[in-house]
């Protein structure tokens, strides 16, 4: 569900032209948004130094900036949350030796795909922080396609875990699982 939410928020970020509002990429320290007027003005001044503000959004107010900043911030925070929701159980199950070799390979690939998405996202944003303040459509397509591939591969890994022979006899559990999968 988080991957789906991430893709939807990414789409909203694109449609609201919010993706270039956060001009710095701090993997760990960037988790805290501006919390007071001074910090908001600092973030806005950083944005003002880039061509998107100078050439397109030069009439943008601090209030409007906060709106576009929100969508990009939310997109990045869901990415961080997704990473934590994945990595913590992954490490736990590795330590407890609860994953077979096939699942270790599959989940390691998922981990790499998730990390790659973050890198591709920043690569895409960097393409718009130049003289031509618009992200590369090619990089955007790569970002979206790899998101879909990650989503599909996640299902490919998870479905055999959900629909095992042991669980197929429990019709209530199977029905609930199908409903849950539809909700995702």
Regions found by a protein language model. Give the residues of each.
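Long, glycine/tryptophan/cysteine-rich extracytoplasmic
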Residues: 28-51
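Hydrophobic cores of alpha-helical transmembrane segments in multi-pass inner/ER membrane proteins
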Residues: 82-88, 145-161
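Interfacial segments of alpha-helical transmembrane regions
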Residues: 1-2, 101-111, 169-184
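Interfacial helix-loop-helix junctions of multi-pass membrane proteins
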Residues: 12-22, 119-140
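Short aromatic-rich membrane-water interface segments that cap or initiate transmembrane helices
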Residues: 33-34, 65-77, 134-146
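N-terminal signal-anchor transmembrane alpha helix
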Residues: 1-31, 184
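Structural signal for the C-terminal ends of transmembrane alpha-helices
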Residues: 90-98, 157-166
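Individual transmembrane alpha-helix segments
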Residues: 46-84
